[in-house]
């Protein structure tokens, strides 16, 4: 559920930002600055980002689940924006200019030109956001101790086996099976992403 919400929010917020960066809506320098800012969550360790969010919003009354969504969105958002902005930059600006000359409004331009030509990039970006959110551990551990995602649950299982006492029904076979399922899931998603990328280039 968390990854789905983060993916939807990432798409809704990422498309406008990608257009602003790719088309230099506010000028060249602001676009360069925004593009550079997109790299920060990619460079900074996720646990550091999670801790900073926790300290910043601590005591604000925001529910842990909402804070977790915010943390995952901050981490995954740049991946979608960079993927989408690169796709938009490949679209000749003359197509949009011609459409605007004929009286098309910005949303019509997006719906008739940008969306059809970037649909595979949107889908591949969404897959990246989804898988990144599913696999995120550091920020989740930093933000909340009450909510557990699959990777955090596996970490807790491993700690219970190493430190003890082991949780009921949890052993090395259980942990191995859970890790194997996550790896299989990642492989399937990456394979789908690869096929989508090839289809988009065709």
Q: Which residues make up each language-model segment?
A:
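Membrane-water interface segments at the C-terminal ends of transmembrane alpha-helices
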Residues: 1-89, 113, 117-137, 142-145, ...
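Hydrophobic positions on the alpha-helical face of helix-turn-helix-like DNA-binding modules
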Residues: 98-99, 109, 113, 154
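Structured catalytic cores of enzymes that bind and process phosphorylated ligands/cofactors
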Residues: 103, 152, 176-178
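Short glycine/proline-centered loop/turn elements that form peptide/ligand docking sites
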Residues: 91-95, 106-107
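Glycine-rich helix-loop "coupling/hinge" segments at transmembrane-helix boundaries
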Residues: 137-172
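Short hydrophobic faces within alpha-helices
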Residues: 40, 94-102, 175
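Glycine/proline-centered hinge or cleavage motifs at structural transition points of membrane proteins
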Residues: 102-103, 116
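Hydrophobic alpha-helical bundles that form the membrane domains of multi-pass transporters
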Residues: 107-108, 117
């Amino acid at each position: 559920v968390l990854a789905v919400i983060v993916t939807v929010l990432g798409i809704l917020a990422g498309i406008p930002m990608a257009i602003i960066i790719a088309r230099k809506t506010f000028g060249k320098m602001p676009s360069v600055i925004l593009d550079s800012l997109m790299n920060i969550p990619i460079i900074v360790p996720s646990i550091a980002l999670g801790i900073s969010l926790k300290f910043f919003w601590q005591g604000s009354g925001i529910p842990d689940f909402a804070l977790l969504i915010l943390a995952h969105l901050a981490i995954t958002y740049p991946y979608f924006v960079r993927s989408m902005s690169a796709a938009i930059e490949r679209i000749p600006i003359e197509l949009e200019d011609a459409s605007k000359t004929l009286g098309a409004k910005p949303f019509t331009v997006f719906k008739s030109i940008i969306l059809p030509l970037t649909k595979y990039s949107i889908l591949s970006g969404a897959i990246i956001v989804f898988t990144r959110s599913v696999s995120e551990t550091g920020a989740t551990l930093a933000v909340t101790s009450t909510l557990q995602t699959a990777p955090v649950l596996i970490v807790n299982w491993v700690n219970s086996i190493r430190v003890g006492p082991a949780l009921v029904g949890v052993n090395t076979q259980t942990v191995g099976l859970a890790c194997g399922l996550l790896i299989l899931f990642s492989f399937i998603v990456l394979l789908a992403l690869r096929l989508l990328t090839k289809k988009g280039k065709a």
